[in-house]
Amino acid sequence: MEGKEESAVDWAYIESVLPLYGKALWLTLRTGTAGILLAALTGLLCAAAIHWRIPVLRRITAAYVEVSRNTPLLVQLFFIYYGLPKVGIKINPEACGIIGLAFLGGGYMTEAFRSGVEAVDRIQEESALSLGLTRFQTFLHVILPQAAAISAPAFMANVIFLMKETSVFSAVSLMDLMFTAKDQIGLYYRTTESLFLLVSAYLLILLPLSLLGTFWERRLRHAGFGT
């Protein structure tokens, strides 16, 4: 009986720390969303550079994609947070998380958008150019809307992947969900309760994203994209 009592979940404790986890959840969401938005913008610009076939930009973009996708986020965060201050560049934990996630995610978003852009028939681009549109106008108004629709499933998969990667932010002292759970375990030995709250918080973030991605993909299939 004593063993059962010791292993029982303390719901009163869970209720008492909900505000603490609420703050950590908001910080994780805020940092993750900012990083993902920057990653999407980076990926879009890189995909455009590849599409326009500018040799220098293509080489720089290719090198960036290889580095960002083939180095762990944790290593990137350590370089930003601990390495850059050695050359006089100091970055706070939240900014470090955003920059690191954007750097990692930009490589994945580049590939997602690039595949979408390449799936658009080149004849459409040639037709738009023959009508007097500039290359930028053609990309913005003709290619990008179709490429975005085609890339949507890969984009949402990347969003979910990157949001899960926020779990390593605690390594640079960002007081996110993982940091809070580890802190509570270390201070009060509330392992079961802390992990329960951690898992619940990430499910609260990721399940809606997963459902949105599935819904979006089905809508696009019905519309005739990505088939």
Where are these predicted regions, by residue range?
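Transmembrane alpha-helices and adjacent helix-loop boundaries
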Residues: 2-227
